[in-house]
Amino acid sequence: GKDQDEVDTALELIKEKKLRGIIFLGGDFRKNKERIAKIKVPFVVSTAAFDKLPEKCIASYVSIDDRTESRKIVDHLCETGHKKIAILASDKKDENIGKLRLEGYREALKAHGLEVDEERICYLDEEDTTYSMENGYRMMKKLLKKETEFTAVFAISDLMVIGACKALLEEGKRIPEDVAVAGFDGLD
């Protein structure tokens, strides 16, 4: 069905087709921990990371080190002179990629002796957790409205950074002269 997610589809296929294994190519598994535990065949998740998988899961994942790569991006912003760096982060309940990327941001600031100002962290709404241009735009508008000072912004997704750029340009900000922007994902 339309509202069916990756885990629902997998559980259905296991039952119908008697699968012996599954490979997930991405997906959003944040709200599915209890249902993930019901998958009784080995599975691999590509391009998604888990901080913790349910016990007794026969699972592996293939992903980059989101924490380290985020830290490298924020390190670069710090090394180019930025001391007030905002982040467009995932929702507060995210325990996967978004959490790891936020941890990398925090680690980089601390490593450069900079304070982590919670006012510069803009979280996705829990109702709509997609890393989209629309959400990046909305989040940047929200950050600008707070009048929190920042010279750079790191978005945890390239799609979000595109939306953020649109919001910055609408407010008359020049990129990178007024605000440097950096995104994550390697979008072409």
Please identify what each model-predicted range represents.
Residues 2-4, 24-30, 159:
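Short beta->alpha connector loops
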Residues 9-15, 21, 33, 37-188:
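Bacterial carbohydrate/catabolite-sensing allosteric modules
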Residues 1-6, 118:
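Conserved nucleotide-sugar donor-binding subdomain of glycosyltransferases
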